[in-house]
Amino acid sequence: MSEEKKVVLSREYVINLRRAYEVSRTKRAKYAVGLIRRFVARHLKVEPKAVKIGQLLNTALWARSIEKPPRKVRVAVEKYSDGTVKVELKE
């Protein structure tokens, strides 16, 4: 039987992405995704592989091309009973 995932924890964060501007221009958006993944993993005590980035958040990071991701992003984070974490853009 398939077990339905239940939300164990729900939080909102404002993640500062200014460190993405310290890397090469052609790697900034990809690095920003990694920053978000590592930030959420550290705060919710999970592995970075368990963090799933939402489609709207990914689109917002890549909207101004790879060279100019946003400086900050407000996100809503949900941790599920199976240990996975979903990160969505908070509007």
Curated annotation (Swiss-Prot):
Transmembrane segments: none annotated. NCBIfam families: PRK01192.1-1. SMART domains: Ribosomal_L31e. Keywords: Ribonucleoprotein, Ribosomal protein. PROSITE patterns: RIBOSOMAL_L31E. One of its GO terms (cellular component) is cytosolic large ribosomal subunit. GO terms for molecular function: structural constituent of ribosome. InterPro entries: Ribosomal_eL31 (IPR000054), Ribosomal_eL31_CS (IPR020052), Ribosomal_eL31_dom_sf (IPR023621). PANTHER family: 60S RIBOSOMAL PROTEIN L31 (PTHR10956:SF0). GO terms for biological process: cytoplasmic translation. It comes from the Archaea. Belongs to the eukaryotic ribosomal protein eL31 family. It comes from Pyrobaculum aerophilum (strain ATCC 51768 / DSM 7523 / JCM 9630 / CIP 104966 / NBRC 100827 / IM2). HAMAP family: Ribosomal_eL31. This is Large ribosomal subunit protein eL31. The gene is rpl31e.
